[in-house]
């Protein structure tokens, strides 16, 4: 198939779900990168840092078309508007370009991500960072991998990393500056942020979560994540042996990932920022 001037691969419906997810994020990411190299303009969504490009739309259109051909009974939900009601009870959740602000400005810290979920939980996740050629995959019965190599960071003699305190880890996070003016958000965020050894705010939640799974980042937290920003990485962190959790504080939902102890301590820190009685 051709999208604009760019050719994309027609995928084989016989691929299993993991193979299909890997191929989809790889092709979507490469398509977006080629379009950026050819020149792009952006449109603002909710803020100056929340933007969308033609590459976001084209990559999502590619994934949508391939899924409708390869998995016609499954539902589809995409960040840029894709919405298909399936009959199988399963739904593919698409983020064609996660980290669009980074993507548009020439950073390598962006990715294409996808998850497959059913009514009970996320089944698998795949994240591809094209400019660093990193593909994280895992979930369900499939242990987490990075470029096909097993991730064992949480499995050291029963999970030594799972017992490491958040104070010994760098934490990845994201918060829009406007939220810092709201005590209902700022207080729990500050409590969690100051509990970590260091902070990293790099601009792509899925890239962050892949690095939690492979050990480059110790833990991660963020509020109000849509499914396409959360489910791919959640599946991979859990498949790597890590922990994930959510907690509601001051009316906001917070999302966490990392080792068991770090996630437990992040949750306690966030809850300590509650201003409700």
Model-derived segments and their meaning:
Residues 56, 79, 95-98, 102, ...:
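Acidic active-site catalytic centers that drive phospho-/nucleotidyl reactions
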Residues 86-147, 171:
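DPxDG-like acidic metal-binding loop motif
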Residues 157-277:
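An extended, acidic
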Residues 1-19, 150, 157, 162-163, ...:
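Short, low-complexity, intrinsically disordered N-terminal peptides in bacterial proteins
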